[in-house]
């Protein structure tokens, strides 16, 4: 690879490159648009030549707005390695010497570089002719009589030089494959350029020039991946060999990798698609040494968790990490990530200092202010708490960034929210070891995104994060969003087939949000009896837009339980349950016991949650105070909709003690199949139920609570309410085959009504397409529908949430009012690699509801009888909240 590096160069933000001591327009510079200019600054900056304006000015592009002070530089004349580029270089060189006949000696020096015996003879001839020309010129000066002779001799020398030049070109042409220029000009000429074969060999090559550049073919010899371009940094004698971006030679010299963008884990020796190779140490090395790392869409196998450093972006770009740790290796051995390394058990031995705080203030007085610096994360914890499974869990915990420090007083980025006695410690404790003998640390300001994961274990577990984002993670693992002490962090677009739990935000997790979460239970069942549990000193956590899908093999006793959290919100979700033996949504507090003090449950809200049960359920919504000192305040169940068989115990249940009533609950719960309302030691609650519910001791309940029950019986319209009792296996192979039809008689529907249909099932086989359609008959007789279309290769679990509503529209031609129906659906197709989510809609005019029947149909068929298509769940309900 040819280089031009004469003089020095600087670059402005607009891409103007200014040279000092440069001759960029010189004919022999060979600098053309498209060449790469590399500034040997720190860090290295690169740009592309757009136009050579003058000997000292170049216009560059793709500069990323970088500003570079005057420094050493190199222009990579890489185009010389292509056929066209090499031809252009040779042509420019020959044209130059044709125009410089008075400096033949320079031409001689140029062609001396070609290693041919005959060329040496020609060079000697040129030298002799040049000397003859000089002698003739001297003779002319000495004698007027000899002038003509000298002139003739000079002309002969000129002609001889031209002949020599032409002979050199002929030698090049005649040399064929023996010519270096011809060899390099071949389509595969680049292979003849000397390059280092692998990283191991690079360690044996000692650089001889400052900022020398070398090309490495591959990380491992023969694999053709992980190579790159390195440069010699003569000013560095201390950086350790990190196995990827800094390679130290046997003589102690540093080769530095030239990196553009996120570091590829290939550059640190990771091997894609090799199940026999543990890439974890190599990925870890890349993350430990760079703040932007990527899998670049490739798949790797790891034998241990990846410990995520702070202030780092790890972007899989669609790549995959699969654990190869044996399932017998123990808790967290098969985890994919460890963003932080925390557990209360490891914190007990860490020294802490007294912290004087004021409720609502961000100023803290520390007994020893030297434990933190500005920018550090401080860990505040109460001296009171509870023993949980043998280790101490503080009643209050807060992670905060230190914004300022004056003497013993620090200011943090949020107010203290407790009046308890607090102690403080730096959140990072490199001198103390946690799980797997790794330092106890908190991951700060990092991003993990666009990665598929596959493990039998939790994909993240013994964590501690502050301002960390997990985005677009999918695959299979023991849990969906699980771990310790997630603070000011975000999980978004997480889609996991799980075998244990959906979520546990434990040990003081606070200000953490879960958004667009899809949790699909493993077909093999679940290991946990509570799949979603928020407990142990958490606060201000939210899950928004979620779907929990539990199959017939996944029957936990409790789906969602909140205990020991406050200011938490669970909203905009769908829960699909086969059988449930305890409760689906619950808030529970167990008070102070001999084990210690548990945090209060305060301000817990469930909002816009739809629950679909195909088998049986016990309690849908539950509030429970187990002890006289249990604290539960400000609980709300807003717009909770239940679809399924009548719960065996209660649609809503509230239980306190004689000395500690359940108070302050607000509930708005609907169930078209009804259910019991069980109130035990409960008062001063505002409760609204819709459906054929029953209330034990109605008079007593109404006397102690604000109670409203809405059950508008319209038998003709509700006669179609339907719950499928068993799986329907579709056998039809005829297109548009009707599996189920619901006819609403004329006059039974109103303009404000909504028909909701929830379906679920599965597809199998890979021969033909499988189709499920839900729709209605329009006034033109056409079927208007939304559709599940499973490809031949799809073998999935699927759900359809369909809603049909009515509205009055104006005919654009007649300007008359007419009735239209709109059907919308939310479709989820889940498989072992995640879930695909989509929505669809159809709108059509229908006949007058007062005069004509309204027909809803479910159509299902498959192209090939050998394939499988089942409807395991079908619930149709008329939403009827008008008088």
UniProtKB/Swiss-Prot annotation:
InterPro entries: Pectin_lyase_fold/virulence. Optimum pH is 4-7. Residues 137-161 are annotated as: Disordered. Residues 137-157 have a biased composition (Low complexity). Keywords: Degradation of host capsule during virus entry, Degradation of host cell envelope components during virus entry, Host-virus interaction, Viral attachment to host adhesion receptor, Viral attachment to host cell, Viral tail fiber protein, Viral tail protein, Virion, Virus entry into host cell. Optimum temperature is 20-37 degrees Celsius. GO terms for biological process: adhesion receptor-mediated virion attachment to host cell; symbiont entry into host cell via disruption of host cell envelope; symbiont entry into host cell via disruption of host cell glycocalyx. SUPFAM superfamilies: Pectin lyase-like. It comes from the Viruses. GO terms for cellular component: virus tail, fiber. Does not affect the antibiotic susceptibility of Klebsiella strains. Exposure to the depolymerase of the phage induces mutations in the cps (capsule) locus of the host bacterial population. The N-terminus anchors the RBP to the virion. Functions as a receptor binding protein (RBP) and probably mediates the attachment to the host capsular exopolysaccharides. Displays a depolymerase activity that specifically degrades the K63-type polysaccharides of Klebsiella pneumoniae capsule, which allows the phage to reach the host cell membrane and bind the entry receptor. In the N-terminal section; belongs to the Webervirus depolymerase family. In the C-terminal section; belongs to the K63-specific depolymerase family. This is Depolymerase, capsule K63-specific. It comes from Klebsiella phage KP36.
